């Protein structure tokens, strides 16, 4: 059911995405008995829709990992479990890999804003930055503003529109605004919409 929802949503994302536009998905594998490789399923869905795969980034969250003791059989080969301290950022394109812009757009409104050192750092496939507190944000699964900020700086120009079909607490919209991009966000949960609007307004003041 969850995968069917993702397929429906990302089919619409593909429809409205500009040629060469990028789709970036933050996702984690789940479970232990059995372990469910959600990233593999999502990759298949996206390729079936027609997206081109650009690569995947590992978000290393180990610096802010909790004190979980869910290691299965402790200090024994009986049934040890891996404790995931990373998530995936899957990157796709529509139609082609290059995001085109005219000479006029390059001069006037659609500009790059990423700094040289950040560009070099962001091309590496492992990103390290801390997680966001669910209690602090008021959302069960928030990601830090740093995550969409990096993707927006790396994959878009100023004035571009950033779409988040699962806007949640509004982190993507906040990052887009900070980076000089426009944004559109959706969510089926009215409480999350109110939360996102509140956070966006706070950032604007």
Name each region found by the language model.
Residues 1-195:
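Core catalytic lobe of class I
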Residues 197-205:
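Short, conserved SAM-binding/catalytic segment
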């Amino acid at each position: 059911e969850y995968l069917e929802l993702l397929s429906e949503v990302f089919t619409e994302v593909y429809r409205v995405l500009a040629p060469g536009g990028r789709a970036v998905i933050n996702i984690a594998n789940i479970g232990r008995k059995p372990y469910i490789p959600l990233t593999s399923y999502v990759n298949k869905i996206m390729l079936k829709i027609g997206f081109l795969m650009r690569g995947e980034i590992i978000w290393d969250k180990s610096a802010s990992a909790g004190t979980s003791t869910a290691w299965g059989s402790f200090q024994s080969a009986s049934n040890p479990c891996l404790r995931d301290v990373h998530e995936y950022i899957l990157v796709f394109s529509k139609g082609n890999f290059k995001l085109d812009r005219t000479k006029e757009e390059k001069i006037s409104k659609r500009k790059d804003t990423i700094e040289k050192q950040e560009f070099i750092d962001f091309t590496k496939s492992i990103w390290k930055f801390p997680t966001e507190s669910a209690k602090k944000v008021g959302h069960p699964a928030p990601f830090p503003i740093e995550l969409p900020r990096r993707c927006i700086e790396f994959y878009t120009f100023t004035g571009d529109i950033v779409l988040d079909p699962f806007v949640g607490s509004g982190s993507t919209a906040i990052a887009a605004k900070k980076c000089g991009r426009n944004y559109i966000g959706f969510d089926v949960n009215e409480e999350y919409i109110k939360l996102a609007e509140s956070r966006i307004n706070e950032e604007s003041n």
